[in-house]
């Protein structure tokens, strides 16, 4: 039976649900502060949990963490912790099954504790030791990897460029200019195209697009216009682009920026182009999206709502809304109640 795992960053919990009924089947509390992303290895049943900062978010956080937790989905126990020091702030995780490597984007430590010290580290899944480290030229928050495990494309947030990394030879191949920066990318099933939502949150003066990178030429081959900002792109088993949309407005009383909308737009590949086929409203800022292997459903974590939306991809409607963590903790400056997702 499938299990849907969702992290509450500010709640420091791993929440387990039956994805069909929507019922909560378990909760692991008191995770290391603060959990961010999830990556499931279906060969071993291990779920890897990244811990990026002790508290806070990308632009305002406490001390970096250098840990990745190992959760056994069979026993439902955290069985180990991977220490990656001196590398700082592991965030996004991907597994190269052919080479038994866990890759993690990091925000520092490769070239010192500077904005330029980020990149990607590779962890041997047998020894759980870091065996690869490749500098990207900036803090790397997210990345995509080609299916053959040869290349990675890093999201460097506000830096204004994407880094192209050779994972085999462990070197930075080149950078691709992306004025305004970017957010969480996706990649086509065959690895031919990577999709970066741009600009990064907080960057003003840029129109929102999905920037499409041709990975054979390492150039931006087209731009898909959007009506509002996008924070993530997930490519499902039918090569549809599921784009997490957001809108931020200024509160009239406090004059602070607040999220006011979240939704998912679906783009269908039509020849070399993409046609928008539907949009559904979800919760506030749909930060992470994954999908069922058959493409029938999408799972959307709404970080500021603390909920997870299950979307019927045939009708583009929300089937269920699961409460992951909707209670704001007084000791947290920002409520981040639903972040990383994994379908186990």
Each model region followed by its residue ranges:
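Predominantly soluble domains enriched in secretory-pathway, periplasmic, or organellar proteins
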Residues: 1-344
């Amino acid at each position: 039976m499938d299990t849907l795992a969702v992290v509450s960053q500010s709640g420091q919990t791993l929440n387990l649900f039956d994805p069909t009924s929507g019922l909560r089947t378990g909760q692991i509390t008191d995770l290391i502060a603060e959990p961010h992303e999830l990556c499931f290895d279906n060969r071993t049943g291990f779920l890897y949990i990244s811990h990026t900062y002790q508290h806070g978010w990308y632009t305002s956080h406490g001390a970096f963490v250098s840990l990745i937790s190992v959760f056994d989905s069979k026993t439902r126990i955290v069985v180990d912790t991977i220490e990656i020091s001196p590398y700082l702030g592991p965030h996004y995780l991907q597994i190269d099954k052919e080479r038994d490597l866990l890759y993690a984007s990091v925000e520092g430590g490769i070239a010192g504790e500077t904005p330029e010290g980020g990149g990607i580290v590779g962890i041997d899944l047998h020894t759980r030791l870091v065996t690869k480290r490749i500098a990207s030229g900036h803090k790397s928050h997210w990345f995509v990897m080609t299916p053959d495990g040869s290349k990675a494309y890093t999201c460097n947030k506000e830096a204004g460029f994407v880094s192209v990394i050779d994972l085999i030879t462990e070197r930075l191949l080149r950078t691709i200019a992306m004025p305004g920066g970017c957010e969480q990318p996706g990649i086509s099933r065959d690895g031919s195209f990577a999709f970066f939502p741009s600009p990064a949150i907080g960057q003003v003066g840029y129109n929102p697009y999905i920037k499409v990178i041709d990975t054979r030429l390492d150039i931006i081959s087209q731009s898909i216009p959007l009506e509002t900002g996008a924070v993530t792109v997930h490519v499902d088993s039918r090569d549809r682009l599921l784009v997490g949309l957001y809108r931020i407005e200024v509160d009239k009383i406090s004059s602070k920026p607040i999220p006011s909308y979240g939704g998912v737009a679906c783009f269908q590949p039509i020849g070399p182009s993409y046609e928008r086929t539907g949009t559904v409203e979800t919760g506030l800022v749909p930060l992470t999206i994954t999908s069922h292997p058959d493409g029938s459903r999408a799972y959307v974590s709404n970080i500021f709502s603390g909920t997870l939306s299950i979307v019927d991809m045939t009708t583009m409607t929300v089937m269920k809304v699961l409460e992951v963590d909707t209670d704001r903790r007084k000791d947290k400056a920002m409520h981040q109640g639903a972040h990383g997702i994994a379908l186990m």
